[in-house]
Design a protein with these regions (language model features):
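Aromatic-rich juxtamembrane segments at the membrane interface
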Residues: 158-291, 296, 550-552, 641-644, ...
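N-terminal leader/targeting segments
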Residues: 1-70, 181, 287, 441, ...
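Alpha-helical transmembrane segments of multi-pass integral membrane proteins
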Residues: 342-435, 691
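Membrane-interface helix/helix-cap signal primarily in integral membrane proteins
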Residues: 55-234, 534-538, 547, 581-583, ...
Length: 763
């Protein structure tokens, strides 16, 4: 079935080009089609071209559909929604559903009004129909590089819009008719199993829900971070290994019932699709089920065995029809890529196979996580067989019998806790390497070079691969350009300054969120991750940056320094610079406690200069780190002078212009998020500001930026950028040459359209 293989690879490259928007994939597709043409096999060429044309039409239609839905304005509407019990998730006082309705498949969010409502929703056991009203809008896109891309994630599930409920009129049980009754039962059993897992000891519950039904608890990442750090996450994603173990278990049981081989095959064909639904239907599980089921079907129909390669090819094409983004996600890349690798590789010892899997998968892992643990190979060699023969069976036994026999549950819990403790211990060993995130060209190049080395394992190609990785790491660690980047951290400030070759890397403020008291019933014991972890540190790692030389803190407000403790816990910082009078505040000292390596703390007054080219121009005397005491910094980057003002008020701005009458500023980080208490017109005019940056949160409760400030900027003809409308704002420069402005969100994005409609309605 060689034609299917060539067609499947062509369709995979086509999806990377048309759906994932990777131009290099178009070049590779052209080369691959030329290779097919050179085979001089008319049948293979025709099958490949027909598939390419068909899939091109499918991908183009999908792109048009989702782009159309993403461009629609928000609208209030009433909806009838059908919701399965296992599609409901509750977090604190909020709930989230995946529902089907008149608007198609949609993500639904809402607020719980009472503890009674929360308890009732937790007890829903069957498919329900919701009659509700809410606001339908496109799913919010990420606003910083490397941030979780919700639209792409939900698009892979066929979802393009979110419905925020404002009122629920009625919830009633949906009728069970036809084949939907069987599907409903499977979803109900999945939900019941997940609820049963919650009665088990904590570690056994986490393993059972993630390994058997594909549901990861909300605390999975925080309590089992070592699994991701050591590259073991693929073991906890339902995929080929789990399906093979399940088939072995089912065959063992069916043979014990004295069923014939043909009857066993028919039972498997019925049970595998059922498990696909029961296991959550993830792309990796779908591939494994299709790959396992196709040879059975082929043998029953033709009485001949089929090749594994044809099964893999059909599974990929079916997967691309179901989810055109399957090869753009880590799970799909590892599932399909490693499965193909196991099919094509010659027979070799298990340790050698593990080495090759690490080599081939490294570029994919770097794109997803930007880091790699040097011990991951050794740990995988130990854990993979242990997982198949001990951990998975123990989890299954504990999940099935643990609630009836407490002794079994406690024994399984003891084993899993000790295993997890060992993993946590190993993960803290030296060896975690932050290498950076390769772009599409680097990722494809490293992957293809690794595959070529597998095909021709010579010393020359080994050296070439090592050289390529060396060049990649050097390009990440020592970039030719520098940048001033205003990170979108919501209603707060955080500015990253990188000198060319990363000679100095500094951060001005960390951002932070205020936490308001909430009713006891809304407290689920989980603390949301700080933005400095999900946005700032994540982005630094993708740049290959492992430490910060200096962190400047403008003053003591939470939206400027609230995430300092998390930053110090996650990343080494050499020094922290604060305005004079702030270093001894209890609030600041508490934020220093999580640091693994305590930084040097320095207090600054106007006139002090620093190694990264910044100079302080405020405060003039020690204060209490209030808004009026803000540390104000200025420096020249790429032939433009920047000034960063924290939350300094108008009086402070005028004081700076009086103290430094010759000071001229090209780019001003506008004070206090655009509040009318800052941005004095006379001060801005004297400074000669040409561009202003608003670091402000969307829909913030303070009404920032104030209309008075916007009028001042318009009157002075100051070009304005806003993190609320354009996401991360970057000024990229090369040494002393003038740089260029870039915004993460392009002109005409959803946030700008929404703001434009709001302004029009207020006029």
């Amino acid at each position: 079935m060689r034609p299917l293989f060539f067609a499947a690879i062509s369709c995979g490259l086509l999806s990377s080009w048309l759906v994932s928007q990777q131009p290099i994939a178009a070049v590779l597709l052209g080369l691959w089609l030329f290779r097919v043409w050179c085979l001089r096999e008319r049948h293979t060429l025709m099958v490949t071209l027909v598939c390419v044309v068909g899939f091109a039409g499918w991908f183009s239609w999908q792109n048009h559909r989702f782009e159309h839905l993403a461009a629609l304005p928000s609208q209030s509407m009433q909806a009838e929604l059908t919701v399965q019990p296992d599609a409901i998730s509750i977090r604190g006082g909020q709930y989230q559903l995946v529902a089907n309705g008149s608007v198609g498949r949609v993500l639904v969010r809402g607020q719980l009004k009472s503890a009674h409502d929360k308890q009732w929703l937790q007890r829903v056991t069957r498919r329900m129909v919701w009659h509700a009203q809410g606001t339908l809008a496109p799913i919010d896109p990420p606003t910083n590089p490397g941030q979780f891309d919700a639209p792409m994630y939900y698009r892979s599930q066929g979802i393009a819009q979110q419905l925020t409920l404002t009122q629920v009129f009625q919830i009633q049980a949906a009728p069970r008719t036809g084949w939907l009754g069987i599907v409903d039962r499977l979803h109900q059993w999945r939900w019941a199993f997940a609820q049963r897992c919650q009665q088990l000891p904590p570690m056994l519950a986490r393993y059972a829900s993630s390994l058997l039904v594909g549901l990861r608890p909300a605390d999975f990442q925080t309590t089992m971070g070592a699994i991701q750090q050591l590259g073991l996450l693929h073991l906890f994603s339902l995929s080929g290994m789990h399906v093979i173990l399940l088939i072995s278990f089912l065959k063992w049981g069916l043979i014990r019932l004295h069923l014939s081989r043909q009857a066993t095959d028919y039972w498997l064909l019925g049970l595998l699709p059922a498990y696909l639904i029961f296991g959550g239907g993830a792309d990796s599980l779908q591939r494994a089920v299709i790959t396992a089921a196709l040879p059975i079907v082929w043998e029953l129909v033709t009485h001949r065995t089929s090749g594994a390669l044809s099964g893999w090819s059909l599974a990929l094409m079916i997967g691309l029809i179901h989810n055109p983004l399957v090869l753009s996600q880590l799970g799909g890349q590892l599932s399909y890529g490693l499965a193909l690798l196991l099919i094509l590789m010659p027979s070799m010892p298990s340790w050698k196979l593990a080495v090759w899997i690490q080599v081939i998968s490294l570029p994919v892992l770097l794109v997803a996580t930007a880091q790699w643990h040097a011990l991951s190979l050794a740990v995988n060699l130990i854990v993979a067989p242990l997982f198949s023969w001990l951990l998975f069976p123990v989890t299954m036994i504990g999940a099935i019998f643990g609630t009836q026999v407490p002794g079994i549950a406690s024994s399984c819990e003891w084993l899993l806790v000790n295993f997890q403790t060992w993993l946590d211990w190993v993960s803290h060993w030296p060896g975690l390497l932050v290498l950076g995130q390769p772009n599409a060209i680097w990722a494809w190049g490293l992957s293809l070079l690794s595959l070529w080395l597998l095909r021709t394992p010579t010393r020359r190609y080994r050296r070439l691969l090592v050289l390529a990785y060396g060049c990649f790491i050097l390009s990440m660690r020592f970039p030719l350009h520098g940048a001033v980047q205003f990170i979108d951290v919501g209603q707060g400030d955080s500015i990253l300054i990188r000198q060319p070759f990363n000679r100095q890397v500094s951060l001005i403020d960390t951002g932070g969120r205020l936490h308001f008291p909430k009713p006891h019933w809304q407290d689920d014991g989980l603390t949301p991750k700080a933005r400095v972890e999900t946005i700032t540190v994540n982005y630094l790692h993708r740049l290959g940056i492992t430490h910060l030389d200096t962190v400047y803190l403008s003053h003591k407000d939470v939206d400027h320094i609230g995430d300092l403790g998390e930053l110090l816990r996650l990343m080494p910082v050499k020094r922290v610079v604060v305005p004079a009078g702030m270093a001894h505040l209890d609030k600041f000292q508490k934020l220093l406690q999580p640091a693994k390596q305590p930084p040097i703390v320095m207090e600054a007054l106007a006139g002090q200069t620093f190694a990264d080219g910044l100079m302080a121009v405020h405060p003039f005397r020690p204060g209490r780190a209030e808004n009026e005491d803000s540390l104000v910094l200025t420096g020249v980057f790429g032939q433009r002078r920047f000034m960063f003002t924290g939350d300094l008020d108008r009086a402070g701005e005028r004081a700076i212009t009086a103290r430094y009458p010759q000071l001229r500023v090209d780019v001003l980080k506008l004070g206090h998020h655009g509040s009318k208490t800052a941005s004095d017109p006379e001060a801005l005019q004297q400074l000669g500001v040409r561009q202003g940056i608003l670091s402000v949160g969307r829909h913030n409760r303070y009404g920032h930026p104030n209309q008075e400030t916007l009028t001042t900027l318009a009157n002075l003809r100051i070009e304005t950028y806003s993190t609320a409308l354009q996401g991360m704002i970057t000024y990229r420069f090369f040494n002393h040459r003038q740089g260029q402005w870039q915004t993460f969100l392009k002109e005409g994005n959803r946030y700008q359209r929404t703001a434009s409609v709001k302004n029009d309605s207020q006029r």
